[in-house]
Structure formats: C-alpha cells, structure tokens
C-alpha cells in the first residue's frame, strides 16, 4: 500500500519530506523493523520511540509516524497529535478494515472476561458456527484449538488487525469474541474495531495505578459501549454498581439487555444451589423458565453464564442450543480450576478485592462441615497498591487460615508488598496467618496445614506459568506446584 493511500483518512498535523513510497508493514520496535515498514514513534512512560527512529530507518523503515518533526531523517514523516492513538487507524487501514466483515463481540469488565469469551465461543460452535477467540490466554480459532501466545489481554493494534484479517480471510471465520481491557480502550489499541456487541461483566477496583480513580476506570470501559451503533447490542450486569451508568452511555438504537441475580433484569437466575458437582439454578426469562445444571461452581460462574446466555439471546441464537453448550463446559484454565480432590485444591486467577471475595465465598459454599477454608495469595508489584490491605482483610474475613506470599513482585520488594497486605489484617494470629514470601514454599506448606476435608484456594496467578521477579522471569505454575505437593493424594 502506498503511503498516501495509508493516510488518506488519517487526521494529521503535517507532512515532512513527503513522497509516495510503498509501505509493506507496520513496526513500533526499531530492532524488528523491516524494509518497507512505517515505523510508529510511540511515546510511553519509560521510552520514546522518536529516539529510535534513526535505527528504524537504518533497518529499512520507509516512513515514520511522529509527534514532532525529526531533523536529519530523510524518509517521509507524518506528524500527528498522538502516535499511540493513531497507530490503530494506521493498522486498521493497512489491513483493509477487517472488523467490517466480522461479527465482532467485545467483553469488558474487571473479572470474568476470559470465562465469558470461552462460553460464547462454545455457544457459537453448538450452533454450528465457527468462532475465534482473542484474550488473556492468547487467541485460538476453535474451542478445541491451541492457544497462540498473547502479551496483553488485548493485543497491540497492528497485531490485532493482522489477526482479525487472518481470521476472516485465511481461516474463513465470521465470528470473533474478544476480551477488551480498559488499557486497550484508553490507549486506543482497539481503535478501528467495529464491534457488533458489547458485554459488561462487572466493574470493581483494579488498575487504579493506571486509571487513578474509579471514575476514570469507568470512563475507559464505557468507551466500548459508546462506540456501538444502531442495531448493535449491549449486555449489562444489572447487579453491578455501575450498571445504570453503563446503560446511560449506550447510544439510541442499540438493543439493551440486562442480566442478574438480585436486581430485576431481562435474564435472571433464581433458586441457586452449589455442590461439589457444580452450580444449579432456574433460568428466568420474560416468557419462559429453564433448569440449568453446570459443571462450574461459584456465584461468579452463574453471572458468567448469565452474560453468555443473554448475549446469545441478543444474537437470536436458540436458548436451548445455548444451554446445551453451557451445560457441557467444565470451566476455563486457571479459573476455579480443581487440581486435587482431598483436600480440594482450587487454583484461581482472582487478583482483585472483588475477585478474591467471590472465589472465597464460592469455595466456602462447598467446604464440608468441619472442614477449613485455606487461602494462599499475594499481590502483584508495580500495580495498584491500595488493593493490598483490602485483599488482606477479605482473606482474613472469609478464610479460616491464610498464607500470604508473593505474586509477581516485579521491581518491588516482596516483603514490602506483604507488609502492605498485612496492614489490612485485624490481627496476625500465627495459628491463622502464615507469611512465606517464596510462593513455591508457601504452596508446599499446604501439605502440613490442610486435612482431607479442607478446601484450599491458591489465588492470584491462575493460568500463568511464570513469575516476574525483579531481574528475571522464571517458570512457575501454581497448578504444577500444587500437584507436586499433593502427589499421592486423591486427584
């Protein structure tokens, strides 16, 4: 594609050294820039792509997207107000607007995005339709397919648009269900994506290191709904504190549907019961009721299933097909995943106050009489520190014993993170509270402090198979560690 064609619809401030050159790719890493790329000079918290522009040109960049003119560089420069926001427009144009030919469904929320995307993919497949999935675990082209790695919940714009084009043209798939993070909305990584539907799971505290306030966090999430157009659909959790605010930003002509357990909604769950086998409830619609039996547990699973069912209704998929699909699902990797039965050991991705509270309440529902609920958890470094004491308080209130350990400490001192967590405890009773900074050792302790009728929750990392330390990233998988510790137990 020629540069003049690439920027035909782009709002730019100036053109420097402009000429018609062929653009054969998009790059924002000077080290991997190839001949014919347009190099995007991204400005971040710690690095400025403008400083690497010459290296990109030396590696073959045919043009630059810049926020300020760069002297002594002879290739064409397109100056814009924000390269971080305009990279999405460039990528969308370069890959010929792939989302326009897709039924693209976006799921946003603090917790539950991954599970809901998987559930909707299953519903499409039960309806004899192909559906690709993009999210935290990577992307995959079918529910039985292999994940391809992802560095972010929502990929960067060039990778995202390239993936959408591949899904449409190469794999011949028309439906895509996609996790949409607040960061990707705020940074416009999903700019250019034309969503046909948007789903809200919930909005609770997370990422305040980035958004600073809950109002800013809400505004970022709301962007997904504000961009919907006539004949699209919006699915909102009616029980969420921010439900009315989300409903208010949905444009006229967009079909609005709600789901919930407590507040009146279009789709509701009543008579909810939990057992070791899973959750069961009565699904209540405006004109019908259905008995639902799940192989997944916890109130959060009920909400996730309601979100998927409501979305299928919005897409005019037969409710019986949706229910058949959901009742055959056994969960998602690292989400309330059972890795041992006696004691019952559950690995979950819960890494927010709300997420931890939900998983512990759900675990309590299935803790046998006389059994203890034990929780191992930590908090990530270089992230919202205000949630640390809150998570400590929640764990102490809901579990009988807690083991405080490291999560992904990153550049922070693990002991300081633990100190922040302990600040939320009412007391530090050594019979009920154990501190072990080494996560592997913390999980190993479970063998000596648990009995067969106990329930153990290892929270925070879920599907992750790595741990990010100050100077390195190591292989670490909570599920592997737990299986080693309880080898020889009933699994």
Language model segments and positions:
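Short loop/edge segments at beta-strand edges and connector loops
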Residues: 66, 81, 135, 180, ...
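Phosphate-binding loop of NTP-binding sites
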Residues: 7-10, 87-238, 242-254, 306, ...
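Acidic, Mg2+-coordinating active-site environments of NTP-dependent enzymes
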Residues: 70-74, 171-174, 186, 195-345, ...
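Short, polar loop motifs at secondary-structure junctions
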Residues: 62-71, 135-138, 238-241, 261-262, ...
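ATP-dependent carboxylate-amine ligase
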Residues: 1-12, 35-38, 254-255, 310-334, ...
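N-terminal leader/targeting and accessory segments in enzymes
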Residues: 1-89, 93, 241, 268-273, ...
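Receiver (REC) domain switch/active-site residues of two-component response regulators
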Residues: 62, 196, 400
């Amino acid at each position: 594609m020629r540069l003049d064609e690439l920027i035909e619809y782009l709002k730019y401030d100036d053109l420097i050294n402009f000429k018609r050159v062929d653009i054969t790719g998009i790059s924002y890493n000077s080290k991997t820039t190839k001949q014919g790329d347009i190099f995007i000079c991204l400005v971040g918290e710690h690095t400025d792509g403008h400083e690497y522009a010459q290296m990109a040109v030396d590696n073959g960049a045919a043009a630059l997207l810049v926020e300020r003119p760069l002297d002594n560089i002879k290739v064409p420069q397109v100056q814009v107000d924000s390269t971080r926001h305009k990279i999405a427009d460039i990528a969308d144009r370069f890959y010929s607007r792939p989302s326009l030919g897709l039924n693209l469904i976006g799921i946003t929320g603090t917790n539950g995005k991954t599970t809901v995307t998987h559930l909707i993919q299953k519903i499409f497949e039960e309806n004899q339709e192909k559906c690709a999935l993009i999210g935290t675990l990577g992307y995959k082209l079918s529910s039985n397919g292999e994940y391809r790695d992802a560095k972010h919940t929502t990929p960067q714009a060039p990778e995202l648009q390239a993936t959408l084009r591949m899904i449409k043209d190469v794999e011949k798939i028309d439906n895509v269900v996609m996790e949409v993070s607040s960061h990707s909305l705020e940074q416009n990584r999903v700019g250019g994506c034309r969503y046909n539907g948007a789903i809200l799971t919930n909005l609770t505290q997370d990422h305040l290191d980035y958004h600073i306030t809950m109002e800013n966090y809400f505004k970022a999430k709301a962007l997904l709904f504000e961009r919907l157009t006539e004949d699209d659909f919006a699915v909102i959790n009616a029980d969420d504190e921010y439900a009315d605010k989300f409903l208010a930003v949905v444009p006229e002509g967009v079909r609005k549907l709600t789901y919930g357990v407590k507040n009146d909604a279009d789709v509701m769950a009543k008579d909810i019961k939990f057992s070791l086998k899973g959750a069961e409830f009565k699904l209540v619609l405006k004109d019908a009721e259905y008995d639902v039996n799940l192989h997944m547990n916890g109130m959060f699973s009920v909400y996730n299933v309601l979100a998927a069912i409501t979305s299928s209704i919005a897409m005019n998929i037969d409710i019986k097909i949706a229910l058949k699909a959901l009742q055959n699902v056994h969960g998602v990797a690292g989400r309330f995943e059972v890795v041992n039965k006696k004691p019952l050991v559950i690995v979950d991705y819960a890494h927010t106050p709300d997420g931890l509270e939900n998983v512990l309440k759900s675990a309590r529902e299935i803790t046998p009489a006389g059994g203890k609920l034990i929780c191992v958890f930590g908090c990530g470094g270089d992230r919202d520190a205000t949630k640390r004491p809150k998570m400590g308080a929640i764990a102490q209130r809901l579990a009988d014993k807690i083991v405080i350990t490291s999560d992904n400490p990153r550049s922070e001192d693990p002991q300081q993170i633990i100190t922040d967590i302990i600040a939320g405890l009412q007391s530090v009773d050594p019979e009920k509270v154990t501190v072990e900074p080494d996560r592997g050792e913390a999980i190993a302790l479970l063998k000596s402090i648990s009995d067969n009728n106990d329930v153990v929750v290892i929270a925070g990392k879920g599907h992750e198979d790595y741990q990010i330390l100050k100077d390195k990233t190591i292989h670490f998988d909570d599920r592997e560690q737990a299986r080693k510790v309880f080898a020889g137990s009933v699994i």
